[in-house]
């Protein structure tokens, strides 16, 4: 049997080195060039609804989105953009705003200069920026406005709106070839060429690489991986990752995580968006949470303390550990906005909530603080471990409440400037 080769040729588990890209500043956020991978999201409000859009951008930003894209599809939306920016500033939010333009972006940016100034980045789709003779002119118009306003641009190809003239040309060339390629391979090549040719044209007009981000989105996982591998191998532009039309619920989460996870592991990607179709009335911020969890799970960034919990089995017929894990997870999410300033570094905390004696003590020892709750037929006692050492054993009807109090004490003492007066010290209790 052949031994699987480790491409890193050492004992360190981790991703491949990051693909070297040119850094782009979007507002005050650095994208590419070795900067931390950026989480972004997009609103689904009518941008002309100023109050509604401010509310959703604020929710996305507070959930952790570091950039937010908004649709600018008509005059009313373009006119609303400066007011949205100003409303966010009044809330103390400086999250960069990205304008998503299709078909008439050149017209809106020219006729609404306040919109062009208020946005931090313009997204151009080379497949619908213009058609025939108008395409190059309208593309140039947007690029020149970006240069004038010192704004970044994302050139985002999408196979749902691919440049048909370019695709037809490549398909005809392929049909005439002695060894024709698969149609999907030709489509992928058209995606990559669309992005790269547009970027080259933007540079000719005067937009530097330090102002450009590229993307090439498809909705099929394997095609997406192939497209981005090709794009990265042929350029050093900053890269935006995303699986378009990923879908709803678990399907969308799994598809996006599978595709982006593979690319990130290969060192590809400078900013990501998880494009989820929300349930009717669902929480738009879920896409931000999933993006953060993907990056944190893979070890690229830390956003919130991690809560490890066992999946449960026949040994854990009690729901106590499940309820406690959920309670701790929800508690952390609610408290993180204030914890970020009060307890620097708290995002690195690891908590374990385990359901029985099999893996409970061992997993708890690997966490900063962990608890092993009793499984079916086990003694009604729950040992707590702090930094790998047994700390105390909780008993009685309020194990969940007692453990949460210990978590709070641990955070205050490890990450606070000084323990709160009267706060319980992390001193092992006599058993």
Curated annotation (Swiss-Prot):
InterPro entries: Dihydropteroate_synth-like_sf (IPR011005), IspG_bac (IPR016425), IspG_bac-typ (IPR004588), NO2/SO3_Rdtase_4Fe4S_sf (IPR045854). Disulfide bonds: none annotated. Keywords: 4Fe-4S, Iron, Iron-sulfur, Isoprene biosynthesis, Metal-binding, Oxidoreductase. Binds 1 [4Fe-4S] cluster. It catalyses: (2E)-4-hydroxy-3-methylbut-2-enyl diphosphate + oxidized [flavodoxin] + H2O + 2 H(+) = 2-C-methyl-D-erythritol 2,4-cyclic diphosphate + reduced [flavodoxin]. Its EC number is 1.17.7.3. GO terms for molecular function: 4 iron, 4 sulfur cluster binding; 4-hydroxy-3-methylbut-2-en-1-yl diphosphate synthase activity (ferredoxin); 4-hydroxy-3-methylbut-2-enyl-diphosphate synthase activity (flavodoxin); iron ion binding. Its cofactor is [4Fe-4S] cluster. [4Fe-4S] cluster binds at residues 310, 313, 356, 363. GO terms for biological process: isopentenyl diphosphate biosynthetic process, methylerythritol 4-phosphate pathway; terpenoid biosynthetic process. Pfam families: GcpE (PF04551). Pathway: Isoprenoid biosynthesis; isopentenyl diphosphate biosynthesis via DXP pathway; isopentenyl diphosphate from 1-deoxy-D-xylulose 5-phosphate: step 5/6. PANTHER family: 4-HYDROXY-3-METHYLBUT-2-EN-1-YL DIPHOSPHATE SYNTHASE (PTHR30454), 4-HYDROXY-3-METHYLBUT-2-EN-1-YL DIPHOSPHATE SYNTHASE (FERREDOXIN), CHLOROPLASTIC (PTHR30454:SF0). Belongs to the IspG family. Converts 2C-methyl-D-erythritol 2,4-cyclodiphosphate (ME-2,4cPP) into 1-hydroxy-2-methyl-2-(E)-butenyl 4-diphosphate. This is 4-hydroxy-3-methylbut-2-en-1-yl diphosphate synthase (flavodoxin). The gene is ispG.
């Amino acid at each position: 049997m052949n031994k699987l080769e480790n491409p890193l040729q050492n004992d360190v588990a981790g991703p491949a080195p990051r693909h070297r890209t040119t850094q782009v500043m979007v507002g005050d956020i650095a994208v590419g060039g070795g900067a931390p991978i950026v989480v972004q999201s997009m609103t689904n409000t009518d941008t002309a609804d100023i109050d509604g859009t401010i509310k959703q951008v604020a929710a996305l930003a507070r959930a952790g989105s570091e950039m937010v894209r908004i649709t600018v599809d008509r005059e009313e939306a373009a006119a609303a953009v400066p007011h949205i920016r100003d409303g966010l500033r009044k809330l103390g939010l400086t999250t960069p705003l990205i304008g998503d333009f299709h078909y008439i972006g050149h017209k809106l940016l020219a006729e609404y200069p306040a919109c062009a100034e208020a946005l931090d980045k313009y997204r151009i789709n080379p497949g619908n920026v213009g058609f025939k003779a108008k395409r190059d002119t309208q593309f140039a118009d947007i690029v020149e406005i970006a240069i004038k306003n010192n704004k970044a641009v994302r050139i985002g190809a999408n196979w749902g709106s691919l440049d048909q003239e370019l695709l037809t040309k490549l398909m005809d060339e392929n049909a005439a070839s002695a060894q024709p390629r698969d149609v999907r391979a030709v489509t992928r090549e058209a995606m990559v060429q669309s992005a790269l040719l547009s970027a080259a044209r933007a540079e000719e007009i005067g937009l530097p690489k330090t102002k450009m981000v590229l993307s090439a989105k498809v909705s099929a996982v394997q095609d997406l991986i192939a497209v981005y591998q090709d794009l990265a191998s042929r350029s050093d532009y900053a890269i935006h990752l995303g699986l378009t039309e990923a879908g709803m619920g678990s399907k969308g989460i799994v598809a996006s995580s599978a595709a982006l996870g593979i690319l990130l592991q290969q060192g590809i990607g400078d900013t990501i968006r998880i494009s989820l179709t929300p349930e009717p009335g669902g929480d738009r911020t879920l896409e931000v949470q999933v993006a953060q969890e993907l990056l944190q799970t893979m070890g690229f960034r830390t956003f919130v303390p991690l809560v490890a919990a066992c999946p449960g089995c026949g040994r854990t017929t009690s729901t106590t550990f499940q309820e406690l894990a959920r309670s701790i997870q929800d508690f952390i999410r609610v408290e993180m906005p204030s914890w970020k300033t009060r307890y620097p570094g708290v995002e690195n905390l690891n908590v374990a909530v385990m359901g029985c004696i099999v893996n409970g003590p061992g997993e708890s020892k690997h966490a900063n603080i962990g608890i092993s709750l009793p499984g079916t037929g086990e003694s009604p006692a729950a040992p707590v471990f702090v930094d790998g050492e047994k700390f105390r054993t909780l008993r009685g009807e309020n194990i969940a409440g007692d453990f949460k109090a210990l978590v709070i004490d641990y955070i205050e003492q490890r990450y606070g400037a000084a323990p709160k007066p009267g706060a319980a010290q992390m001193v092992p209790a006599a058993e």
